[in-house]
Amino acid sequence: MASASQFLLEDQTDEDFFDKLVDDAYSPTEAQASSSVTELKFDDESDSDDIRAFSNLSIGKDPLGGGDGTLNEAILGNDVANEGASGSVGEDEPSSIAPEAVQFPHSDARELRDDEMRSEVADMPLSETAKECTIVNEPGIPGVKELDWGSFDADLSVNDGRGFGSYSDFFTELDATAGNLQGKADVAVATGGNLVANDTNNTSVGFEQHQGQLHHDSASGQYVDNSQSWENLYPGWKYDASTGQWFQVDGHDASMNSQESYENSTSNWENVAANNSDVAYQRQSTASAVAGTVENVSTWNQVSQVSNGYPEHMVFDSQYPGWYYDTIAQEWRSLDSYNQAFQTTGQANDQQVQNGNSFTAVDHSRESNVHDVYDKNQILRTQKFDIQSQHGSWDQSYYDKNQQATNMWQPENAGAAEAAVTPASLSNSGGNQQVNNLYSTGPVAEQFKPYESGVQSFIPQHMNVANVTQNGPMSFSNGFYSRQESVDDAPQSFQSSQLFSPSAGRSSDGRPPHALVNFGFGGKLILMKDDSGSLQNSSFGSQKGTGGSSISVLNLAEVISGSASYSSLGENSLSYFSCLDQQSLPGPLVGGNVGSKDLHKWLDERILNCESSYMDFSRGKLLKMLLSLLRISCQYYGKLRSPFGSDALQKETDSAEAAVAKLFAIAKEDGVQNGYAPISQCLQHLPPESQMQVTASEVQNLLASGRKMEALQCAQEGHLWGPALVIAAQLGQQFYVDTVKQMALRQLVPGSPLRTLCLLVAGQPAEVFSTGSTSDISFPGSVNLPPQQPQFGCSSMLDSWEENLGIITANRTTDDELVITHLGDCMWKERGEIIAAHICYLIADKNFDTYSDTARLCLVGADHWKYPRTYASPEAIQRTELYEYSKTLGNSQYTLLTFQPYKVMYAHMLAEVGKLSTAQKYCQAVLKCLKTGRSPEVEMWKQFVSSLEERIRIHQQGGYTANLHPEKLVGVLLNFFGSKTHRPVGGMPPPAPHSTKGNLQGNEYQHQQQEATKLAYSQSVNTMSSLMPPASVEPTHESGGSGRRMAVHTRSVSEPDFGRTPIQEMADSSKEKAVDGVTKLKSSGSVAGSRFSRFGFGIFKDTVGRVLARSSKEAKLGAENQFYYDDKLKRWVERGVEPPAEEAALPPPPTIGAFQNNSLGYENKSDMIPSNGNWSSGGPTPSENSSGIPPISHGSNQFSARGRTGVRARYVDTYNPPGRGNSHTMIPSPSVQTAKPPIPAKAKFFVPAAPASFSNDQAMEPAAAETRQEEISADEVVASSGAPPPMMMQRYPSMDNIQRNGLGISVNGDNHQPPTSRRTASWSGNFNTSFTPPTSPSTFKPVLLNSSSSSLGEELQEVEL
């Protein structure tokens, strides 16, 4: 910034110089005579006042129109001068325009006394060759006449090789950076009120650096170096250098002011000026005129950033004034329709600085006039738009595109009493506004076009104006390079013009239009924007979109990968999209086919990523430790610790504990090397050697005398812990544990790993986290460590948690999981280290829980307490899946059920980024894991997974539910053919009937099955052997090409078979009986032909139906039902088929009396009657058992009459468990079988097989006989009696309390029940009726069953009848 002394040297002129210069009365001799006068003389001001006085000068006409060309300085009133060294005073109330002058809102002037200010300036030395200069004010003749301008370049040696300088030097030396100045020969200073003057020493920030313009509203001229530049300032006029005269160009209208060219005097202007723009003027007329007003012509200082004010799609051409080409609409349009948007009057707004500690910079645009020699009352003035800009500091760099303002020129009638638009009424629109110098073109005939608002537009032809285009930040301090303006460093009230409607193009709530963005399924990003230009021109509100809207469907992964934040360092590299896209696991681990090599590669990459420089050291160290722990778990099949009590030697060589301990040791070494972990001390007190010698001698003497207790106590007090542990081990386990505890508490530092291990060995886990010490003994001359700082809680334990966890893991003790778990809780709650806490939980093998306030583990490394909504991140899900996979390596049946919902979430995340195939694999893996679950939440999870899988499948098929892809269609047809060929070919052949030699019951049972095949619509009873599948499940087959094996359940006996009609198949075929009685079908050609013809037609029909599906939307109700229920027959009957003839009813079974057999010796029935003559048993009588139906063997019942041979011998007979009878205690049945009447071959009633003898039974059932145990032999009570042996009741597991009917003796020794009451078992408690002939005297052995307390819980309830 130029100093005051520089201004004093440059301003060494006086009033006489200008008077003589204007009156053409100046001569070189006078200039030389006055060259010695160098002082500035003012009436009452200081040396700096001449600067302000000179800055208020302007070139203008004679106020009175006399044309004498005198210098007149207008009266200034209520001016406020700011002489501060750093700052400018804000303008509170901008003054209005005086009737006789034009206001300079920010002129730098001081308050002047009286109504006139005179300046006495010393004469400057001029060359003697200077000619006279006169002012000519005649119409058609230039107002300035130059006789000889060469004198300004004379005397180069006097002015540092530049002479006095040219006319441009006269102003540029005032300010080395001033440029783009225009001026006239006449000077007039405007009058104004409440003017704010800034000290010129402090009004420009970064003045020297930016080639900017000095902040003076001063009269100045343009920096020109030749006559061509002067001719550009006066369009229509030409300067003749030889004669020094100005001549008007023929055919040119001076009032048009067309083709103005603006040049910049700064050295950098040529480097930044690029484009062309058009200037638009608006003329505003006033209501009245006041006589005697002075026409004031000010200068317009060009702003360096000159954007044309129009959108980029508007292209102008000088050949077509008044028109512009719209590149979007591809057509020419009139500029008048576009200019109507600028009719709105700005509103005054006081912009408030909203950001604290911010500076407000105001750029003052210059007033500029276009002089019309015919209309002396016309003044062209720019509306003033002060742009506020907020900065954080003076050293910030700015993008010039964010510093924007708008200038609009308005020609104004000088005779106006009051202006319609004044600078005081113009408002400033804050924010990032574009610097627009609004230019327009138009024909001369439309010079004054009235508008409804009373604003007339003065439209010149197209002009060439340099436009600054700057892309990138410019490093400078709060000097706006783009505008080359000065900056005031204090907030002010500033005015501007809002050239657009604030509500134009906005919604009802005032929001501007914007593009619409939405996310689509499958990683799609849908973008909808308006291409009609409404977004670009929304601030003007005058253009209507003609280009329409466009919808773009983008891949989300490509958009994210192309962004700058995706590849940047920091947390973004581990962000959501990065983890799913580039760092995702290689497919589902559980239920997938991932290779171990790929998995270890992924782990190595993640661990290496934790060591990057951008990640925080503490977090990176913990995350690396967690991933390394998971890798160890995969290497040792899900085990991080060996079971307690395993081989200690194996633990040291190759075990999970050794790997985990090594991991913590490496982490500790890294921390010590990096200075993060100090070396810890373990011992509290070190007794001196002399004291240790005394203690050892005393302990030795006590042991020699046999006083072990006193020796142990002496060793503990003297801290001689070695001998103390040996003595305590001899005294017992309790003494040993107590000694270890005393040593840990009294000598080891709290929180040290050695103390932790000693306390765990002593069985004192509660003392691990204590910080107190019981050592209060001080030894004379002992070496004590520095006192420990008082610590709260278990902070000392947490400081070295890695070492403590490592020593606990490597040295397994009882219940150390509780200590590890508590350590993790403390790390989470007190330190907030979630990763460290989860490391402890994984080593302690804690279970994963569902989300709750008390759950410890939901996802590995995720804090569900602190971040309940976002803890389910992709990284945490990947780590948890890795842990689940390590567990399944050791146990293939392991399922982490609570983790399956997070897998579904991960599948959704993968689908969002476009990885649909991987997401579908996860859905299939989750469904596979949920097969075994039966809880309600599992069923809900299955529905979610199925819906997601279906949505992915439909999306992959292009939105169609049926996949008609040629490759997949072939597979569907092949599966379909395979399912159709299953019916004619048939499944598993029916098994041959199983029979047992010598077992009449089995033959009769098979005979009943064979006869049942004659019944219509019935299904034969299962006759397959145990090698065949169960009867309720038919052979499985592939169904419908779905790849799933489905078991088709058979129907019950009463359910009709709608798929097959055995009556129709048997009607046309001949039947024959086999030798064994099994019905066989004759294979005839007609049957086979019809069968295969139906098969071929069915294939053709179904194939055509699947491939050529009907496009109609009619419901397919299927064929009419051919079956109906016949109320008379009480069964289902097929239409058109004769019902089978009614079969004859079965004859009644033979009566019991017809098969009485007295061969068993039951004649003496009185011997069996007890003394009371009452049988309270509900079982059959001996007479009933002597019927023709043979009694069932005592070793089996009627439900297991068939022999247990072959495979059946390996299975448990639930109806006849072993141990119910014993050959030694039970009386065998007679060897001779009882006779029975012959049974017809085709008898249709069930006849049980004859019971096998005991010997045969024992031979047929060797396995069962060997497993029978004697249960009641030890409890028998032998009683001498002449009566025959009583009826034996077979014992069942729950019949200990049954009354011994017939004996009169209860189990507990009480008397029997009265005859009116009886007891029956709630289970199948039948009585054995096997007796032997009376070969001995009347004696009987009453058997008392032992009632053990162990069977009380298994006893069945007895029913009182």
Curated annotation (Swiss-Prot):
Subcellular location(s) of the protein: Golgi apparatus; Endoplasmic reticulum
Polar residues: compositionally biased ranges: 996-1013, 1169-1200, 1222-1234, 1308-1325
BP terms from Gene Ontology: intracellular transport; protein transport; vesicle-mediated transport
GO CC terms, sorted: endoplasmic reticulum exit site; Golgi apparatus
Gene disruption: observed consequences: No visible phenotype under normal growth conditions.
Residues carrying Phosphoserine: S46
Protein name (record): Protein transport protein SEC16B homolog
Gene from which the chain derives: SEC16B
